[in-house]
């Protein structure tokens, strides 16, 4: 599945600007880090505690060490003392990143290729997938989740506590009020969404979510023995919309001209302080010296809601670098070479085998994983085993006006939205999303005409090719000059697509309305619907093995309406 090719990685300066004065193959180990104290005197007496912190919609430019105007002293310090991941990739929207983190598999192998899981959809992370916390439980870990789930909840079996977490406090949907925890999925379809375990946590309403989640992490640490390995998954709601922040954080950004940027900056700084409190609790309760802290964003910043991905192209929801290049670093006393920047190619699917390996377990491509164990690359500066990334193939998003099978050399329909990185080359087909280069927002009102101008500039294309090492800003399209590379990468897309399973994107169910669940979002599926879903999953597995069976007439009719509904919902998105 993974082609081994030469790869030149991207150099990222600590101020967030990408340099052009070097090219270094990915198969060469990183340069030396700070000597001396970086070598631990002895192996840890037990598997390390693992703390994975995931932020929501934090842009590439929205951290101090990338030259931002936002204050993030904690993140800056932790990154400086650890290993900055400056060739790190995530997915462009919420659900795909979270699903790949917890399964180690690309979207094409879980059926979540299209969009996100919406609150009223009978859909969730496939139940036949063994999740990262389940693997860590097998290794003797206590597992806890705090924050945003966004991987489906229509059945109780989909809930975090049924997918490997011993405890859970957070929201099930993708977007809630930071104080009231209300979420509206359309006019009049509103409900409360804060859960503790499998119960609605009505009594915790009114507390700002970033602070509430940090307090819960501290409580978990205070009540847990450092002698038992611990996995903490902290998925902050911050800094996703709505833009809400405690007043004391807003005051320090009162001179910012752009209101959205001002609120967003306050939220980022509040989140930074929450990370400081979590780190302090790790030290206070005796966990820190045997801990590995991973920090990651989930997708690019939403540029018209305060975020910034400058100087990268694009934003959240796009396959340009601004949508898929992630913020990431690892901080740990267990790192063998600290205080350095790693340019090893890393993808969010890699955390699954990497963390399972740290826990003493095994996980590899033989288990159907798309991720690699990148701990030697991170901790020791060795070469990354990864040489390519399938960003995605979305067969339902095939509306690019100028795409065709002919334009894809007869092997690929370029109207289909897809993106792949192989070595130093990146190929995009279909509609990758809005391709602006948007500077940090400083004006009181952002000129929306820039948006339309950029769209018009690329309106007649459906294939792009970039040398990401030489052109990290994606300004020079080489598709016309290098048809040989285009054809080779299209062939890789074809190879990947042969392994894809059908998309899971069902129609919304009216019974999911919170009014039928006491005013809160929560599981709603009946036993009959659960059986039907299991039958559908079985058909999907049979399809992926090439053994589709004939269906009865009513089944065909049902399938027709499902596909029709999917098309309509895709158009709506």
UniProtKB/Swiss-Prot annotation:
The gene is ARSI. GO terms for molecular function: metal ion binding; sulfuric ester hydrolase activity. Keywords: Calcium, Endoplasmic reticulum, Glycoprotein, Hydrolase, Metal-binding, Secreted, Signal. Substrate binds at residues 148, 240, 316. Its cofactor is Ca(2+). Glycans are attached at residues 277, 289, 467, 497. It comes from Canis lupus familiaris. Residues 1-23 form the signal peptide. The lineage of its organism: Eukaryota, Metazoa, Chordata, Craniata, Vertebrata. Residues 526-536 have a biased composition (Acidic residues). Ca(2+) binds at residues 56-57, 94, 298-299. The keyword Amino-acid biosynthesis does not apply. It holds the Pfam family Sulfatase. This is Arylsulfatase I. Its main location: secreted. Its EC number is 3.1.6.-. The keyword Zinc does not apply. It is found in: Secreted; Endoplasmic reticulum. Binds 1 Ca(2+) ion per subunit. One of its GO terms (cellular component) is extracellular region. The oxidation of Cys-94 residue to 3-oxoalanine (also known as C(alpha)-formylglycine) by SUMF1/Sulfatase-modifying factor 1, seems critical for catalytic activity. InterPro entries: Alkaline_phosphatase_core_sf (IPR017850), ARSB (IPR047115), Sulfatase_CS (IPR024607), Sulfatase_N (IPR000917). It is an enzyme of class 3 (hydrolase). Disulfide bonds: none annotated. Displays arylsulfatase activity at neutral pH, when co-expressed with SUMF1; arylsulfatase activity is measured in the secretion medium of retinal cell line, but no activity is recorded when measured in cell extracts.
